[in-house]
UniProtKB/Swiss-Prot annotation:
Mn(2+) 1 binds at residues 410, 422. Mg(2+) 1 binds at residues 410, 422. Mn(2+) 2 binds at residues 422, 424. In the C-terminal section; belongs to the RimK family. The keyword DNA-binding does not apply. Residues 266-449 form the ATP-grasp domain. GO terms for molecular function: ATP binding; metal ion binding; ribosomal S6-glutamic acid ligase activity. This is Probable alpha-L-glutamate ligase. Keywords: ATP-binding, Ligase, Magnesium, Manganese, Metal-binding, Nucleotide-binding, Protein biosynthesis.
Length: 466
């Protein structure tokens, strides 16, 4: 009979086959599978077998230690994450060392940056071998910081990548955190720049960008603008200055401006022959009745030109309601689009994420009960979806029409085919990354690398410190 090991809620273990002399694991008998933090996961074929390459930051909040490995794939498995979303993960088999015992376990690979532990030890890996004392921790011994430093010192890497600035307003937003993390994980120096704290020197001989009281921003290779609608004018001015300084931007200022002006964007879509709901725009209240008739009558959608994330969008269910809202908005000098309501969509739409002229991910969004807006910020839900070829073509064409490198393209399914709703130049990452499990932030960083012709240096094979 095998002697069982008693462990606490967290323990240090090692995975020698991966070159991990020590990694802290969360012990969770409530989880069936074990998982390991991994990123830059790339599948490939070797001797007609499926393999993956991946990288690991074994120490929480320390990205200077990077280990790269290649492993054969056992399978791909659906695993329900903490948000209740099922992710498809690669599964590998590795030898686990826990205390003085060792045995093979299966590990699923996923990005655990948002979680407190780089590894989770689930019940399938412990059955018949481990007893868990949930009130204890480090039952098999703890490690001091200096011990960890000695173990991982040979594996620390200096950042020799690009210097990339994220131009935004709040570094704590999910999308911004993910972009900063993704850049660091690929070996780049990431810097957050608050839009409002940047200011410029306009000089044809020596244009400059200053930040927070006089610091001159120099040697930046690329900028990712993530500009809030409320600061579009200033944010685009700052982005243009970076462009004037010869710095690559992931979405230039003019395409961002086009995407923020719903009327201009719609006119560009029409010019490029892209299918969209019938839309009307007028200035005088005398034209209200004909404007409503123009788009097929009520019910219809009313959109403020300056709205975003579902704000400033109203469903007018009757002719009288539509007239009242339109005339009220005109009396306030608010610019308003009137748009055909696509009833057969049933409160659903598609969000296609486009990077570098390709749809890299897509979700179907469903409106919350009692609402017609499917935006996740308005309480809608999302799930991964396989889009049709004509939907993929429409998303890519819309992005090109505006000149964007990265975009979230909203499409609605109708009886006459896919219709283009809107293109977002700063698409949120949380909903779509959670629903699909795809590292979209990493793909955005890779697009910067592609634009600049930067080739990532292969990391050396890991060595276990003695």
């Amino acid at each position: 009979m095998t002697r069982k090991i008693i462990v606490g809620s967290e323990e240090w273990c090692s995975l020698p086959g991966l070159g991990l002399p020590a990694i802290k694991a969360r012990v969770d008998s409530g989880a069936a599978t074990s998982s390991l933090h991994a990123f830059n996961i790339v599948p490939f074929q070797r001797d007609e077998a499926r393999w993956i390459s991946f990288e690991v930051h074994p120490l929480q909040n320390d990205r200077s230690v990077v280990i790269r490995r290649e492993s054969p794939v056992l399978e791909q498995r659906g695993v329900r994450n903490t948000s209740g979303i099922t992710e498809t993960r690669y599964v590998i088999r590795e030898q686990l060392v826990l205390g003085e015992e060792s045995w093979p376990i299966e590990l699923t690979l996923t990005n655990r940056d948002a979680m407190g532990y780089r590894m989770l030890l689930g019940r399938e890996a412990m059955v018949g071998r481990v007893l868990v004392d949930p009130e204890g921790s480090h039952q098999l011994g703890d490690l001091r910081q200096d011990q960890l430093e000695a173990m991982y010192a040979p594996l620390r890497t200096e950042r020799n990548g690009l210097r990339i600035a994220l131009l935004a307003s709040d570094p704590e937003l999910y999308s911004n955190r993910r972009l900063l993390e993704a850049g660091e994980e690929r070996g780049h120096r990431m810097e957050f720049l608050n839009v409002k704290q940047c200011y410029m020197r306009l000089d044809p001989q020596n244009p400059e960008m200053h930040y927070r009281g006089g610091n001159v921003l120099e040697r930046i290779n690329a900028v990712i603008p993530r500009i809030r609608p409320s600061v579009t004018f200033y944010g685009c001015a700052i982005t243009r200055q970076f462009e004037a300084m010869g710095i690559s931007v992931l979405n230039a200022a003019e395409p961002i401006k086009r995407s923020r002006d719903k009327l201009l964007a719609s006119q560009l879509f029409v010019r490029h022959g892209l299918n969209m709901p019938v839309t009307g725009f007028a200035s005088s209240p005398l034209d209200t009745k004909d404007l409503i008739k123009m788009v097929g009558g009520a019910p219809l959608i009313l959109k403020l030109l300056e709205g975003a994330q579902g704000r400033g969008v109203v469903l007018a269910e009757t002719q009288k309601a539509a007239e009242s809202v339109i005339n009220a908005m005109k009396s306030l000098n608010a610019n308003l689009l009137v748009q055909e309501f696509i009833k057969e969509a049933g409160g659903k739409d598609l969000r296609c994420f486009v990077i570098g002229g390709k749809v890299v991910s897509a979700i179907e969004r469903t409106a919350a009960v009692g609402d017609f807006r499917s935006n996740i910020h308005q309480g809608g839900s999302a799930q991964a979806v396989r889009i049709r070829p004509e939907e993929r073509k429409l998303a890519v064409s819309a992005t090109r029409a505006l000149g964007l490198d990265v975009a979230g393209v909203d499409i609605i399914r109708s009886e006459r085919g896919p219709l283009l709703l809107e293109v977002n130049s700063s698409p949120g990452l949380e909903g779509i990354e959670t629903a699909t499990g795809k590292d979209l932030a990493g793909l955005m960083i890779q697009e910067i690398e592609r634009k600049l012709g930067w080739v990532r240096t292969r990391l050396s094979e890991p060595q276990v410190a003695c």
